[in-house]
């Protein structure tokens, strides 16, 4: 049975970087006889142009229908700031999900890019951390939320940060499961000194920990975690945290890798059905169409897809090795360039990864 993948390039730099990821995926598909069949549709600003909305019902239905039974998706740019986006519309983090979603974002520093990190090489050398972010609850989706005008004419707004025990337990188990197959260390990040939701978070994580005696659990307040990520990031192996904290910390961690252009991510449900994308989302519209965006995070998202959703570890490892080989050759896009390296564009970087993969 063929495995269906829906490719959603989106807008901004999306079509450029997605084209390179598809090149790599197509070679891996042929080389390892993976049996993938690719389909294409629009998302974000490109969907606004075609359908009048950022995510059309027919696109969502196509994802559900075409991708059955595997239902694997890849997307790139959501176009969150696209002019003409319907007022008040908020894009779901994973509108294709069939259940609760978590987002693992691996922060791996390739040794060739130690100089590209803003931290000293000895601080980040050998860095390999994983941030597991709860993706469907918390303050981004909590209710009630309101902006209103007070009687005295002053504007006031508020949001709500709710978490249920089951939501916390589910994401905690994911964090422990991933820590168990890595370095057996899990750091749960919260703000339990002031937030009731974080106090429940910490209590439930402690309960789940009883089922994982082989994993060392620690807790850290989010403000301290943000500081520790730049002071001593190698103390972390797996971090599990809520939606907003994970959103912030994963962006911070991206700079430890040299550039946010190096950081892939996945939005996965309980069955590892997923939507894969670079962490940078729809950023850098200023360079869209110039052919200079870094495609490596998107290419590494392909590797994540093969590993997590399809269990194709050999192919996933090969793509990561191909990226490392290209970096060994001194090829760099502008965001990771340093003296002594050769600056290349989006397509040339993608072609180089394809060539390296072909030799493995």
From Swiss-Prot:
Record has NADP as a keyword: no
GO biological process: L-leucine biosynthetic process
Database matches in PROSITE patterns: IDH_IMDH
Pathway it works in: Amino-acid biosynthesis; L-leucine biosynthesis; L-leucine from 3-methyl-2-oxobutanoate: step 3/4
Needed cofactors: Mg(2+); Mn(2+)
Keyword set, alphabetical order: Amino-acid biosynthesis, Branched-chain amino acid biosynthesis, Cytoplasm, Leucine biosynthesis, Magnesium, Manganese, Metal-binding, NAD, Oxidoreductase
Functional summary from the UniProt entry: Catalyzes the oxidation of 3-carboxy-2-hydroxy-4-methylpentanoate (3-isopropylmalate) to 3-carboxy-4-methyl-2-oxopentanoate. The product decarboxylates to 4-methyl-2 oxopentanoate.
Subunit relationships: Homodimer.
Protein name per the record: 3-isopropylmalate dehydrogenase
Organism: Azotobacter vinelandii
The gene coding this protein: leuB
């Amino acid at each position: 049975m063929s495995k269906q993948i829906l490719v959603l390039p989106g807008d901004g730099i999306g079509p450029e970087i997605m084209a390179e990821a598809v090149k790599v995926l197509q070679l891996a598909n042929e080389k390892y006889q993976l049996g993938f069949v690719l389909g294409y549709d629009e998302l974000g600003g490109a969907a606004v142009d075609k359908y009048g909305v950022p995510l059309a019902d027919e696109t969502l239905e196509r994802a559900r229908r075409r991708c059955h039974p595997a239902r694997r998706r890849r997307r790139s740019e959501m176009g969150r700031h696209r002019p003409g986006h319907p007022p008040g519309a908020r894009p779901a983090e994973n509108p294709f999900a069939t259940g609760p979603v978590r987002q693992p974002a691996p922060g791996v520093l390739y040794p060739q890019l130690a100089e590209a990190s803003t931290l000293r090489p000895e601080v980040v050398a050998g860095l390999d951390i994983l941030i597991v972010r709860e993706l469907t609850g918390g303050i981004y989706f909590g209710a009630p939320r309101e902006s209103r005008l007070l009687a005295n004419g002053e504007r006031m707004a508020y949001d709500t940060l709710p978490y249920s025990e089951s939501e916390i337990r589910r994401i905690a188990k994911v964090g422990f499961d991933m820590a168990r197959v890595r370095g057996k260390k899990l750091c749960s990040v919260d703000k339990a000194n002031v937030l009731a939701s974080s106090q429940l978070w910490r209590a439930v994580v402690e309960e789940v920990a009883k089922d994982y005696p082989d994993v060392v659990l620690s807790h850290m307040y989010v403000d301290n975690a943000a500081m520790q990520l730049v002071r001593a990031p190698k103390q972390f192996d797996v971090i599990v945290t809520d939606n907003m904290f994970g959103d912030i910390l994963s962006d911070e961690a991206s700079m430890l890798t040299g550039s946010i252009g190096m950081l892939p991510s996945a939005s996965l449900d309980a069955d590892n059905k997923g939507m894969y994308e670079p962490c940078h989302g729809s950023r850098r519209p200023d360079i869209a169409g110039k052919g200079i965006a870094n495609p490596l995070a998107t290419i590494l998202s392909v590797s994540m897809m093969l590993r997590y959703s399809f269990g194709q570890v050999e192919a996933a490892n090969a793509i990561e090795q191909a990226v490392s080989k290209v970096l060994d050759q001194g090829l760099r896009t502008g965001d990771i360039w340093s003296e002594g390296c050769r600056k290349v564009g989006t397509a040339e970087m993608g072609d180089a990864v394809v060539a390296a993969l072909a030799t493995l």
